[in-house]
Amino acid sequence: MLDAFSRVVVTSDAKAAYVGGSDLQSLKSFINDGNKRLDAVNYIVSNASCIVSDAVSGMICENPGLIAPGGNCYTNRRMAACLRDGEIILRYVSYALLAGDSSVLDDRCLNGLKETYIALGVPTASSSRAVSIMKATATAFITNTASGRKVEVAAGDCQALQAEAASYFDKVGSSID
């Protein structure tokens, strides 16, 4: 996983060049948006349990067979595993958002996830749906539009961060499908 600074250094080093020009400008923008990025990650991690439990509840409401005998969320052990997986996915999305780089998702979360779910008989459509619900909830926190929950936000538009976070959730969802 490379953060924005490491990426610039590695790229410049590969070219045997000093860091400068557009690379410095991109780092300057990254720093200027740093407080918004930190706030966005804080909103997600502060509400992680709510985001994950709402996503799993929504997934179950849309597919009640998941909690029927034989369903993948039937028994406390399976429900706990489902919630745990949601927490892990959300945690890695927050890491990616903090770093401004999705490689942590590829390296530590998504590599083999679909194959594992298939081997365990986990319905990938339901898992993907839970991820899309997490996406909607998390991005609402980032833009401070989550119903019933308003927080003090850093000044400025957070649409770019919302789109970035959404792209990470989309990456997770498409890797499961």
Swiss-Prot record:
Quaternary state and partners of this protein? Heterododecamer of 6 alpha and 6 beta chains. The basic functional unit of phycobiliproteins is a ring-shaped hexamer formed from two back-to-back trimers contacting via the alpha chain subunits. The trimers are composed of alpha/beta subunit heterodimers arranged around a three-fold axis of symmetry. The phycoerythrins also contain a gamma subunit which is located in the center of the hexamer.
The answer to whether keyword GTP-binding applies is no
Listed name of the protein: R-phycoerythrin beta chain
User: Residues that bind (2R,3E)-phycoerythrobilin 2, according to the entry?
Assistant: N35, D39, C158
Q: Which GO terms describe its cellular component?
A: chloroplast thylakoid membrane; phycobilisome
Q: How is it modified after translation?
A: Contains two covalently linked phycoerythrobilin chromophores and one covalently linked phycourobilin chromophore.
Species this chain originates from: Griffithsia monilis
Topology of the protein relative to the lipid bilayer = Peripheral membrane protein
Superkingdom of the source? Eukaryota
Coiled-coil annotation: which residues? none
Q: Where does phycourobilin bind?
A: C50, D54, C61, S147, G148
